[in-house]
């Protein structure tokens, strides 16, 4: 299938891009600038597109993102430290973010005669982000079937929606994903902080997958204390 991947530049979406390139016909990556403080991730998405020799579309929706206030990812609100399973991580929710981005991606896919849009939502996101859950994926597909009826037929591929981030690391290694060429940290510093929810989840995923983590973190050991109170089953 001719497929466009929504790629933030993070571990999940870059791994997905490599998977789609190996298993489908990857025709491009689409990324979004929504005013996120960690927009350096877009550079890693661009590197992925160059590596896979496909076009890279960066859609500027920062004007919209500026109105979706109240998130630590876009506003002057401190990004909380700790495990993704903690209630404080809801501060990183950007309301309706995936619905907005996917609607644009589907429009792009229809215009380019693509067969599918692929997105890297995964099981570890379910606790915090409602627009990463299977119910949302299914409902969005039904909505797009109506929105594009008679014009285009575009599938929403979400191969990781029921699996853990550790499983994505395993799949990424299978498809030769260069993990060092991905960015996860929400704080957007020179290095991954090692303390925010996505850094902790990233470090834990490599540990659970039994695959060496090439990432350099400012705090190499914080993740151990952060995950010690949760079992893998409780957060996935």
UniProtKB/Swiss-Prot annotation:
**Key word Repeat present in the record?**
no
Q: Which reaction does it catalyse?
A: 7-carboxy-7-deazaguanine + NH4(+) + ATP = 7-cyano-7-deazaguanine + ADP + phosphate + H2O + H(+)
Which family does the UniProt entry place this protein in? Belongs to the QueC family.
Gene3D superfamilies named in the record: HUPs
Name of the molecule in the record: 7-cyano-7-deazaguanine synthase
Q: Which residues bind Zn(2+)?
A: 185, 193, 196, 199
Q: Name one Pfam family in it.
A: QueC
Sites binding ATP sit at 7-17
Keyword Transcription regulation (UniProt): no
Protein keywords: ATP-binding, Ligase, Metal-binding, Nucleotide-binding, Queuosine biosynthesis, Zinc
């Amino acid at each position: 299938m001719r497929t466009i991947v929504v790629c933030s530049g993070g571990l999940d979406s870059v791994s997905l891009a490599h998977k789609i390139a190996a298993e489908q016909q990857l025709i491009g990556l689409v990324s979004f600038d929504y005013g996120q403080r960690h927009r350096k991730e877009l550079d890693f998405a661009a590197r992925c597109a160059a590596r896979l020799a496909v076009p890279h579309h960066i859609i500027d929706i920062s004007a919209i993102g500026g109105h979706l206030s109240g998130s630590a990812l876009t506003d002057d609100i401190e990004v909380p430290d700790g495990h993704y399973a903690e209630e404080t991580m809801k501060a990183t929710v950007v309301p309706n973010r995936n619905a907005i981005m996917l609607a644009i991606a589907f429009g792009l896919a229809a215009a380019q005669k693509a067969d599918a849009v692929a997105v890297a939502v995964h099981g570890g996101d379910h606790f915090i982000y409602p627009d990463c859950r299977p119910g949302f994926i299914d409902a969005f597909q039904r909505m797009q079937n109506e929105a594009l009826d008679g014009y285009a037929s575009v599938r929403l591929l979400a191969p990781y929606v029921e699996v853990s981030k550790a499983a994505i690391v395993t799949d990424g290694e299978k498809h030769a994903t260069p993990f060092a060429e991905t960015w996860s940290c929400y704080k957007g510093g020179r290095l991954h902080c090692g303390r925010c929810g996505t850094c902790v989840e990233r470090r834990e995923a490599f540990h659970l997958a039994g695959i060496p983590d090439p990432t350099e973190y400012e705090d190499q050991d914080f993740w151990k204390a952060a995950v010690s109170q949760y079992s893998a089953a409780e957060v996935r």
